[in-house]
Regions:
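Basic, Lys/Arg-enriched alpha-helical interface segments
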Residues: 1-71, 80-86, 92-135
Length: 135
């Protein structure tokens, strides 16, 4: 059997010019059980590809995570050669089915900012943890 060299994508988080990471801050503030559910959903996308996510528009995709009476959403964009980076741009809680336009617009704005600053350059690999749940 031939062995294939499949590169598994890794998650990165949008950071502002000041180094703030709004997605990480949102996810760190979640209760541990909810953070664990988000990590499981993000792992599924990393392992199974974009078909495990919902396409929104352009380069944007959505991770949907059902928690308690609402849902957590993480908007992200694949980046790099062969989409080897999944860039988390926006995370929020919601109750409606459709992603609010303001969050999609914010994700697109952050993606333009990220690419405009050249922030997509490779970084050292690290373990990502949210409130005790490891991605």
């Amino acid at each position: 059997m031939a062995r294939t060299n499949t590169i598994r994508p890794r998650w990165r988080h949008y950071t502002t010019n000041r180094g703030d990471s709004p997605v990480r801050e949102f996810l760190d503030a979640l209760p541990a059980d909810d953070a664990a559910k988000v990590v499981v959903a993000m792992r599924q996308i990393r392992e199974n590809g974009l078909q495990a996510a919902r396409h929104l528009r352009g380069d944007l995709y959505e991770v949907r995570v059902p928690v308690s009476d609402q849902g957590i959403r993480v908007l992200f964009a694949p980046q790099g050669k062969r989409s080897t980076v999944l860039l988390a741009l926006v995370a929020y809680s919601k109750k409606s089915q459709q992603a609010p336009a303001r969050f999609i617009d914010l994700a697109e704005s952050r993606l333009r900012d990220w690419n405009g600053r050249g922030a997509a350059r490779p970084q050292r690999r690290s373990v990502t943890t949210y409130n005790g749940a490891t991605l």
